[in-house]
Amino acid sequence: MAHNTVADMSGFELGMPALVCRWRIYNRHLPLANRHLRALLARQVQGKPLTKELVAWAKQHIEWTLEQGAVEYPQGVLMLILDTEGRAAMTVGPFEPLEDTRLDYLIHRAEKAQVEAAQTHIAPETLWLARNDMLLWDQGDLCVPSGASSLVAQLAQTMGIRVQPYQGLLDGVATGALTYDEAFLVSDEFGIVPASDRRGSHGVRMAQGYQRLIERA
């Protein structure tokens, strides 16, 4: 059943944001567009699923928005904002890399994303760990993978790396109960970000493979 409606984009101001998606642009294109849209359809806002109408609107406006905004920011970030009334807007802004890539900060970002996922069913950023030639990540009970996470899972499969869901991963890292070799953040906005103080070969390989796929998309 449709719960959200798409308002005419002309002549209105957005109200209180209920959802903000930030998707990385590469060379004036949105390489993970289909993955982002599938994840968007799985999201909920204020306990209600988004409609196919809204996702169709987003798909159409991605092209229009990139034609205009990506001229100024060809390597920028496309932002989709949905307010509490179900009205949507889309814009493009500059991309600014993470200045702090220490593990503690990446954990902090993953924790914030987990709070968002409890409400929307999608975590835009997740922490991944490498242990004994296997990747661990916590998708959450009710959540489906974000666009970036779904690509990383597929990329790992093509590399012959096993991916294992691990519930309570962030708590295990925080308490020291979980042993691991390296860590990296997977983000719809920032891609794969290896922790500067827990960097390793798996994260580097994944980041390189991710970048190659983005460049070819």
Where are each of the predicted segments found?
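Conserved alpha/beta cores of soluble small-molecule-handling proteins
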Residues: 1-132, 140, 150-217
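Short, contiguous acidic and Ser/Thr-rich linear segments
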Residues: 136-146
